[in-house]
């Protein structure tokens, strides 16, 4: 009977420690948040906070890549293709409670710093909310 008690307590502990912090999930994951975030993401949908208009994003090569160690690559086809830039590089970091991610990148001498609230962080899907409340959904690239 004692042998059954310890695995149950361990599973309960895991469930409490890994409870979902993000509104759209996951509720539980054994993978650390950084591991789930550190991959290449393709934007698939944009939701405007002020109008609630949902815009599907075409597969045009745009991506956001969070690299292990805190580096970042960002490419927005609509903004960067006409100036011939392959990608913007920068850095990223979690907030202390890992509910937000701050990205910093430079493009043609101009720097940009944005903080996004993580709404969803699954192994194959991500949703970020910007400072204006606009939400962008991403899928694993």
Regions found by a protein language model. Name each.
Residues 1-7:
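Bacterial N-terminal signal peptides that target proteins for export
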Residues 15-18:
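C-terminal motif of bacterial Sec signal peptides marking the signal peptidase cleavage site
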């Amino acid at each position: 009977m004692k042998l059954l008690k310890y695995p149950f307590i361990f599973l309960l502990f895991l469930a409490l420690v890994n409870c979902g912090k993000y509104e759209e999930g996951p509720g539980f994951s054994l993978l650390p948040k950084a591991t789930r975030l550190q991959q290449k993401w393709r934007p698939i949908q944009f939701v405007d906070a002020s109008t609630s208009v949902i815009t599907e994003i075409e597969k045009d090569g745009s991506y956001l890549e969070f690299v292990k160690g805190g580096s970042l690559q960002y490419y927005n086809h609509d903004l960067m293709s006409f100036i011939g830039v392959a990608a913007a590089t920068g850095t990223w970091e979690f907030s202390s409670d890992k509910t937000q991610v701050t990205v910093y990148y430079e493009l043609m001498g101009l720097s940009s710093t944005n903080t996004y609230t993580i709404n969803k962080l699954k192994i194959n899907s991500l949703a970020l909310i910007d400072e204006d409340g606009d939400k962008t959904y991403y899928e694993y690239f």
